[in-house]
A protein has these predicted regions:
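Helix-turn-helix DNA-binding helix
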Residues: 31-35
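Intrinsically disordered, low-complexity basic tails/linkers immediately adjacent to helix-turn-helix/homeobox/MYB/SANT
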Residues: 41-66
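Residue-level signal for the short linker/turn that defines the boundary of a DNA-recognition helix
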Residues: 4, 16-19, 30
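Short helix-to-turn junction characteristic of helix-turn-helix DNA-binding domains
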Residues: 12-13
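Short alpha-helical "recognition helix" segments of helix-turn-helix
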Residues: 22-25
């Protein structure tokens, strides 16, 4: 689903700091602008929905513990 892909792109960026073009390559050659848009969509959704924001932040926190 596009929601899952967008969240994944956001999380990869937050955890690794990878360049947008490199994240795009992980997702079958999506362009850097597609990745940027996806990250912006997730940031907007997080700003509008505190429960969603906490869920994403918890995922990131749990992944950083490994």
């Amino acid at each position: 689903s596009s929601d899952l892909r967008q969240v994944s792109m956001y999380i990869i960026r937050e955890i690794t700091g990878m360049k947008l073009v490199d994240i795009g390559n992980v997702f079958n050659g999506k362009t850097h602008s597609t990745v940027n848009h996806s990250i912006e969509v997730i940031e907007d959704r997080m700003n509008e929905n505190p429960v969603f924001k906490k869920t994403v932040e918890d995922i990131i926190k749990n992944m950083q513990e490994f």
